[in-house]
Structure formats: structure tokens, C-alpha cells
Amino acid sequence: MNNKYTIIKQESIEELNGTGYILKHDKTGARVVVISNEDDNKVFQIGFRTPPQDDTGVPHILEHSVLCGSREFPMKDPFVELVKGSLNTFLNAMTYPDKTVYPVASQNDKDFFNLVHVYLDAVFYPNIYKKPEILKQEGWHYDLLSEDAPLTYNGVVFNEMKGVFSSPDQQLARIIQKSLLEDTPYGFESGGDPKAIPDLTYEMFLDFHKTYYHPSNSYIYLYGDMDVDEYLTFIDEHYLKDFDEKQIDSSWEKQEPFTEVKRVEEYYPVGENDSEEEKTYLSYNAVIGDSLDAKLYLGFEILNRVLFDAPGAPVKKALMDAQIGKDIQSSYDNGIMQPVFSVIAQEARDDQEDEFVKILEENLAKIAKEGIPRRNLLAAFNYYEFKYREANFGRFPKGLMYGLQMYDSWLYDDEKPFIHIKTNEIFKQLREEIENGYFENLIKEYLIDNNHKTIVVMKPKKGLQKIKDQEEADKLKAYKDSLSEEEVKKLVEETKQLKASQEEASTKEELEKIPVIDIEDIRKDVKPLSNVESELGGVKVLWHQYFTNKIAYVKLAFDMSHVPMDLVPYASFLAEILTIVDTTHYSYQELGNEISIETGGISATMDVMPTDVHEFLPMFILKTKCFYSNIKKAFDLLKEVAFESKLDNKKRLKEIIGQIYTNLKITLTETGHKSAANRAMSYFSEYAAYREAIQGITMYETVKKWYEDFDEEYDNIVNGLKEAAKMIFEKQNMTISYTGKEETPEFMKAEVESFIEGLYEDQKQGEKVKVTCTKSNEGFATAGGVQYVACAGNFKDAGLEYTGALKVLQMIFSYEYLWIQIRVKGGAYGCMCSFSDQGDSMFVTYRDPNLSESYKVYDEAADYVADFDADDRDMKKYIIGTIGSMDMPMEAVDMGARSFHAYFLGKTEADLQKVRDQVLSCTQEDIRALAPIVKAVVEAGNRCCIGNEEKIDQNKEYFDEVKHVL
């Protein structure tokens, strides 16, 4: 290792098949951790301990701002330049309640070095000291377009946090943390409270950076297969050597334990047309020890699953049986110094508070006294051990997730970065404790005898959002009225100057400071598909031959093309309830235990694939994952789930419908962009209309009716479930997907044949499902403070064809045109677009303060494309960034899913290669030629917006109909 650092400790980490090193930089005291192994998806992170001292959101605003240009990379937005021209597998930055982290990842050596270089320069030498407009753009500013116009606030983080605070769940989480840890930095909002963000001054902003963004307060992490010495040398010679060690007081005292349980009451907004009945959130919250206790950290995760999260978990079941709220959720945040545990009753009556607490405490006391059934504990253990060992984090690199988890201990003890990663020994210790009453004692110590608890009640209040908006408007008006004529003119001028600086492009010289890898460094060929066809028991098998480390991934896919549209919502509901209702041989709690003990999970889902213009393939999928040795038990459980589930338990069905109802509400408020985009596409796309019926606003309205009129709807629901199951589970509909390499599909022959025997007899199939699209433009009013603005169309309906160049255009739009117009100038948190090879296409914004302005941006998008101009270097960057987004690393199970989808979409490797070749050869002229496609999409005039009721009312001319959705 480099001689500028001292190795504090070296240890083997078998869980990551590598060696961990704890180092300290001699000159500055910077903390460094290296995990060296053979993973080619390399990760770098630099983090800082950033405890907030108020609610202005300065840690969050700074996280955005340091990525807006630096000493060596002075262009306006190096982050965007990296996204556009990098093969990164991860590139982002995150603000937590007590730390700010800047991670990057890439499999390409040159690319990885560039990412590390840009990020180090950004955090240590940002342009914020010479460009005050960065704070205005990313944080907040006064916006005054003319002397007569109303004064408003704008800024990316300001609008992002308005969106966050529009979600009752997010609001509650923040109140809970503050209620328990009010005398620590956790009592403040690190992301920023929209009410307090405008209190942040430029001086406070710079002072925060000067104080905390110093090597002596830094946590640097390198992971993967790389020349570690080369990186340590670079980090020292380019950055750390220029600093001296500094005493930085970024630590804090723990919250003193309470002597008695506290109660907190707050309010959240609901729409003017909404009822306030049964909309109260009740929560029971406790501080759970210390995050440096590795055994407790993992042990309480297991306990939470046993008591609340597993199907049929006893304490949750007791609360559901008493009809406390529509759903019961638990959360365990162990990513802070003093972990916080919460039990939340969603949408309860406000008179149920005492009953909620009484049932909770009585059941906890009963379990602590009588003991936890050993099979329940064993199931929770197996669930977490499988999860930890499989280590499939989806699109997030393994090294990234391990690095983030490291901060859960490293931030509070320099010598303990690995304690939450080295889980094998902890699992062993915890297993030994099963018979010793350890878990029962956790209940006593932290949930019964612990006074460091709060009861937080959050009640609905009609018109509260309007009151907040009016208070903000009044405050701004009073401020404007207090200004002299000259001061008002100055504000108008400052607004113009900010807009002008946002319009101003970085110079060619600035842009060329970031090295770009060569096109030659990019793999030319697509990753191969693997669909080896065979048969078992007369059913087609698709074998995806990828190495899975002794785990078999099996999907039983059933074609639903013939299931009529009126049964589709019931089929969607069937997918939700399988595995969480009683069966012939098990209660749903027992079934959950068996699934966790014998497999890595069993689930049901619906999948819809767009196969051609106005054509789609719906599928009902049962899937499991297990060790090869457990395949018989896995199929026994699949049979139990598919053929023995009790679909007529009235009480249980109502509980599940209530849970789905609340979850769909959360989806509409927190990911409204997805709902708005799909709804806009459903006006013309049968594929999107079908998706609407199973997961969109249409499904929300269906579930709402089921819940509110449950007694009248019950018979229809049961009949619909049974009828859908009969039509789905037929042999003629079935295809098996198997991902694994260690065994051929023959290893499960007997199990498959036994499953087939349980299927319903094949019936004569009716005609293919028909979906009717209804052309409309809709505004959905909510009590939220921001908008999700969508428009959509199908360019193939206009006689235009798909080309891989559209993938490059998507990159250009997302990080050039839409980024500048919607995010930089408009202040929205996000903006995106997509163009499918079936023609369905959309534009949508995310946490957007605007509405009409965003539609104008879409209207002018085709002109931007027609006039598109970029030099060859920029074009190369767009191509590299596009390929990077196409080439994200995938686990074996994801490669199997990719092959499975390609098969049913009729895509060959040659088809995929053609698109890749079109991306790699894309020219400026190819982009300009796409203007008619963009024009066709926008001019199709399919609009949908989910947003603030007042904003929608002010812009109702954009819509044929305005509805109140929540």
C-alpha cells in the first residue's frame, strides 16, 4: 500500500470473497477503506459526516451544488456531462440524516478513473465560491419575472422537498425521527423543509462546505478489482496532500433516553373534496440501542420480520383483526447512530389511538412471556440468510451497497467499518441464541421496558395545503411590498440574470476538460441471449444457461391473452393474494414460514409485454428460487399456492384490499410520474390501457370501490378470483422459464409433471382479449404541492419507424433539452422520456412546480430536434452514455429474465444487434431526422397531469376532465 497512508487493520471478508483494509491518510487523517476482490464492477465513494443544525436543507443543497462545476472541471454541470458520456454503472449522490455520500461505479478502467477524478474535484474544489447562482438554481431563489408579477420561490431542492412533503408517509417518517431524537442533528430535516429552505443564506451555505468538506472529515472507499496503489497515490498527490489535518467537530452526543413516553400530534393535508374520516396515521416508535451493536443491528431486523413483516406475523395480525387502520406497517431504520423502530397504522380512525397502543403492548408482552414459536424464528432467519447470501441488489452494484452499509458503523467508529458486512459470524451467534430467549429479551428491553418511545398521531386536515400555499404567497407578497421600487427592479434583473446564466452553455474548452473514452473501448456485440427450448410433461421449457451458484430460478408463466377484460382486475388481485391467504394445508402464517424455510421466496405477479403496435401479451407468473436440493419442496409449495389457496375468506380479503388501497395511494403521491405517463399512453395504447387496469389509476379506482362497498362487492370478488384462476391455470397456457447452469431442466421433471396434474382442464379458448382505449386529456387533483406532467403518443400510428437512434435521442433529451428547460430553468426535480420500438412514447416531469410551462417545453421539442447541432466529440459522448445505460451489469436471474422477454417479444440477437449498431453509428443527421417522430408524439395531444388541485384548476383548459383522485 502507498506510504502516505498507515494501514490500521487488514482482515479477510469471506462474505465478499476479498480482503478489507482500514487505512488513515498520514497528513490529513482522512479515513480510507479498501475492499480488494475480483469484482470488475469497481466502486468509489467519498462521504462526509454532515450533521444539520437547522431545517434549511444545506447538506442536501450542497450535495446538488458541488456537482455544478469545480476547479479542474469548470463546466456548468460535470455530473450531466458524465452521465452523457460515461459507461458508469452507478453515478449519483445522496444526502442522509447525518452524512452526504458521493458514489460512482464502472467496469471500464479509464471510465472509472475519470469518474473518481471528477467527483474528488467536485467535493474539494467546487465552483460554489465564485458562482452564487449555483445556490439559487439548486437550492432556492426569489423568482420575479416582471415588476407587476407575483413574487415566488423556485429552486430544484425547494421543489423536490415540496414533493417529498406532499407524501403523508414521508411526512410521518420525519416527524417520528424528530420526536425521538429531537436534541440531536436527527431532530432537523437534512433534506430541507420547504418552509425553512428560504432561510438559507449564501454565507451559511459556504460555511457548511468549509466546515465539513475537508479530508479530515472524509470517509473514502475503494472496492473491486483495481490497482489500489495507483488510486491511493492519485488521491494523495492530486488532493489530500494539499490539506493539513484539521480538528472538525462533526460528532454529536446521543439523545438522552426519555423518562416517559411522549405523545406528538401533527396534521397533513387532504384535498378539499376528500373525507377526513379514517385517514389518521397512528404510530408507536422506539429507539433501539446503538448501531455499533452488530448483533442487535441484524437481530432486530429478524425480530421485526417475525413480529410484523412476515405473512401472518402475530402482532400485525392482532392489530388487523381489531380493524385498526387499513394497513399496519413497521419500519426499522438502522442506518443512523440510534436506530429507530416504528409500527404504523395507516388510515385509522382518530379514536383508535388508545386501542392501537393497548393491543400492541398486550401482544408484545404476551409473546415476550410465552416465547416466539421456533419455526417463526427459523423462517425469518432463512429469509435473511438467503437474502444476504444471494446479494442481488438489482441495478445497484454490490460494492456500492456494501459501501453504503459500511457507513452504518464506520461513521460512528473509525475502526468498525466491516461489522455489518461480516454477517456469517453474526448469523451463527444469533442462531445459537434462539433457545436462550435472546429475541424475547429484545422485546422486553426495547419495546416494553424502554421509555425512549413516542406515540405520533398524524391527522388529516382539509385545505391544509391551500393554507400553506397561501401563507407562502402572503409572506412573499409582504416581502415584495416592503421593497423599494429599486429593490423590486433589482429582483427582476436578478431573475433575468439567473435565466441568462442558465441559458449560457459551457465553452468547448471547459467541456473538453473531462476526458472521454474511445468508442473503440466499447463492446460492439450485444450480450448473448440464452433460450434453450425443451419440454417437460408436454409443456415448453426455456432454459437460460447462466451460472447461479447452486440456486435454481424457476418461473411458471401462463399466457392470459384469452382472459376477458372484465376478469383482468381479479387476475391482478389474485397475484396479490397468493402466498398471503390460507390454503388447504396451511394458515397463511404457516405457509409464509414454509416458503421462507424451504425456498428463497415464492411470488405471483402479472407481466404485460408490448409485442407490436397495438398488440401485447399479458402473463400471469408464479416464480420461486431455491437451492437445487430443495426443488421438490419448492414445487410442493407452488402447487399449494396455485391450487389450494382459499379465495373466499371474507375477513382476509378485506384486509388485503385495504392494504392494496393504501399502497396504491402512496404510489400515486410518491411516483406520480409513472401513473401520469401510463395514463396518458392508455388513451391510445392497448398495452398501456391493460397496465392501467392492473396497476394504474384505473386499478386504484377499482380497489377503492371494492373497499368502500366491500359487502356488496364480496361475491363478485370471490367469483372473479375463482373464474380468473380457472382460466389462467391451464396446461395450454403454460411455459416454464428456468435459469441455472449446474443442472439441466430434467432435474425437475417429476416435480413439473406433478404440478401439471393439478392444473385445470384445458378449455376451448375464446378470442383474444380486447382492450378499448378512450381518448381523453385528464387532470387529477391531489393535496400535493407539485405536479407530474405527462404527454404521450404513438409515432408508428403516424407511419414512422423505430430506430436505435431514438435511444440516443432519449439520452440527449434527458440530459440536455429537458434537463435544461424543465430542471435547470423550470426547477422540477426530474424529467424523462421514452420511445418504444412499438411506437408508444411519452414525456413526463417529476416533482414539477409548473404545468403549462412544461407542456410548452414538450411542444417545442420537435423544433429542438430539427435544429439539433453537436460536434463529433459531443456526439461520441451521447453514444457512450447511451451504451452505458444499455449495458448495466446484470445478475444471472436478470439475464434469464432478459432472455425470457426477448423470446416472447420475438426478438433475436440479430434484432438487438441491429439496434446496438444503430446507436454506435448514430450521427447528428440521424438525430435531426427524428424530428417528425417527436412531433407526432406531442401533436397526438394525449395529456395527463397529477398535481396540486389549485394548479390544475388554474390550467383546466389543458384537460377535457378534471378529477379528484385522492
Residue ranges and their predicted role:
Residues 154, 206-238, 691, 696, ...:
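Non-catalytic, conformational "gating/processing" segments within enzyme and secreted inhibitor domains
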